[in-house]
Amino acid sequence: MGVRAQQKERTRRSLIEAAFSQLSAERSFASLSLREVSREAGIAPTSFYRHFRDVDELGLTMVDESGLMLRQLMRQARQRIAKGGSVIRTSVSTFMEFIGNNPNAFRLLLRERSGTSAAFRAAVAREIQHFIAELADYLELENHMPRSFTEAQAEAMVTIVFSAGAEVLDVDIEQRRQLEERLVLQLRMISKGAYYWYRREQEKLAASRVE
């Protein structure tokens, strides 16, 4: 990559980070302006268009980055699990670590999931579906269950995890610890329920063949 290309990439990165830094519990992406983001990144507003067509394209890039960041962290968690440790507890700790280190990235996913922009809703839905698919792949490999079961289990787990994440954004350390423990319990219940449901279906199938 040449010097100019490197500089362009650094400026693009600065715009993304500037936009993330301006998000908060009180401020959503929709309230950001091109001028504010450009000023925070240290460039002229007119230079913004060398990197993004408009603010919406910047936002969609941020959604993609947030989803990818979360998936990469969860992949690392699965690598740690392979070396020993509780699957669910390690996954929950990793997820909470993501929220703690990247609260605005998670806020963006939460808000735009049900926001007014169809493009943003579709982008967040796509990221969540990627997350569900990767978890379903892992469950299918580890638990030796059919895809239909692991997808249903993964979707239930991701729904609960995102709901808990929304609560974690606004609590203190002790409340966060309690939420983590509750989430671990809920995910274990889903996991055991999926296993016993699958086993029951297998027993029913075996019985029907005997008859």
UniProtKB/Swiss-Prot annotation:
The record's DNA-binding region positions are 33-52
Cystine residue pairs: none
What is the protein's major site of localization?
A: cytoplasm
Query: Any idea which GO molecular function terms this record carries?
Result: DNA binding; DNA-binding transcription factor activity
SUPFAM superfamilies, A to Z: Homeodomain-like (SSF46689)
Asked if the record carries the keyword Chloroplast, the reply is: no
Its GO biological process annotations read: fatty acid biosynthetic process; negative regulation of fatty acid biosynthetic process
One GO cellular component, as annotated:
cytoplasm
Residues forming the HTH tetR-type domain are 10-70
Q: Which UniProt keywords apply?
A: Cytoplasm, DNA-binding, Fatty acid biosynthesis, Fatty acid metabolism, Lipid biosynthesis, Lipid metabolism, Repressor, Transcription, Transcription regulation
Report whether DNA-binding shows up as a keyword of the record. yes
The subcellular localization recorded is: Cytoplasm
Q: NCBIfam families per the record? A: PRK11202.1
Which function does this protein serve?
Represses the transcription of fabB, involved in unsaturated fatty acid (UFA) biosynthesis. By controlling UFA production, FabR directly influences the physical properties of the membrane bilayer.
The record's subunit annotation is: Homodimer.
Q: What is this protein called?
A: HTH-type transcriptional repressor FabR
Source taxonomy lineage?
Bacteria, Pseudomonadati, Pseudomonadota, Gammaproteobacteria, Enterobacterales
